[in-house]
């Protein structure tokens, strides 16, 4: 595993493209399209992709994933965080690999611009279902969080979420992924 990074690659046609349809306070904001860097971070990208499509099943055999989950943490000029469909508050963790967490895949890509998709974690090798999207360059996260995708359409939606009113970094109105899947 390398801590040195390279610039984010251009969109690669073989990489999966997923989407989130997002609502704020019950009102639709629009669609985010995300490229997953399966060519650089295949395990991390696949974990996220299956939570977008609902292919992953819980212990009861029901689909589990991002549909209906919230962006529970929003910090202006930093990032928007979501993906905790377990508890909804940033404490839950789940993977497609049958464990609550999985290891950091690599730190090849850097947090060098807005619109990057990266794993939220609670320390080394604690990746699960939570993710964040950067709203600025965040180089202090390099070597700590795995970059595994980028926003390819809908950065205006990210900015709307970033600018929503919050109390202690929690949006005052629910920011919900009302639909998601693979393009």
Swiss-Prot record:
It is found in: Nucleus. GO terms for biological process: protein folding. Residues 19-182 form the PPIase cyclophilin-type domain. The keyword Isomerase applies. InterPro entries: Cyclophilin-like_dom_sf, Cyclophilin-type_PPIase, Cyclophilin-type_PPIase_CS, Cyclophilin-type_PPIase_dom. Keywords: Isomerase, Nucleus, Rotamase. Its EC number is 5.2.1.8. It is an enzyme of class 5 (isomerase). SUPFAM superfamilies: Cyclophilin-like. Its main location: nucleus. Gene3D superfamilies: Cyclophilin-like. Coiled coil: none annotated. One of its GO terms (molecular function) is cyclosporin A binding. GO terms for cellular component: cytoplasm; intracellular membrane-bounded organelle; nucleus. The keyword Isomerase applies. It catalyses: [protein]-peptidylproline (omega=180) = [protein]-peptidylproline (omega=0). PPIases accelerate the folding of proteins. It catalyzes the cis-trans isomerization of proline imidic peptide bonds in oligopeptides. Belongs to the cyclophilin-type PPIase family. PPIase H subfamily. This is Peptidyl-prolyl cis-trans isomerase H. It comes from Emericella nidulans (strain FGSC A4 / ATCC 38163 / CBS 112.46 / NRRL 194 / M139) (Aspergillus nidulans). The gene is cyp3.
């Amino acid at each position: 595993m390398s801590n040195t990074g390279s610039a984010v690659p251009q969109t690669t046609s073989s990489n999966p493209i997923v989407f989130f349809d997002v609502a704020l306070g019950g009102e639709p904001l629009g669609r985010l399209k995300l490229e997953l860097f399966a060519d650089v971070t295949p395990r991390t990208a696949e974990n996220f992709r299956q939570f977008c499509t609902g292919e992953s099943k819980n212990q009861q055999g029901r689909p589990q994933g991002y549909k209906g989950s919230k962006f529970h943490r929003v910090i202006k000029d930093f990032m928007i965080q979501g993906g905790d469909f377990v508890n909804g508050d940033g404490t839950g963790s789940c993977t497609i690999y049958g464990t609550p967490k999985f290891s950091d895949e690599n730190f090849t890509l850097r947090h060098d611009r807005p619109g990057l998709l990266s794993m939220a974690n609670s320390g080394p090798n604690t990746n699960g279902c939570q993710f964040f999207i950067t709203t600025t360059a965040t180089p202090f996260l390099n070597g700590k969080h795995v970059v595994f995708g980028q926003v390819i359409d809908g950065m205006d939606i990210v900015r709307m979420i970033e600018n929503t009113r919050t109390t202690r970094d929690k949006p005052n109105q629910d920011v919900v992924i009302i639909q998601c899947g693979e393009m």
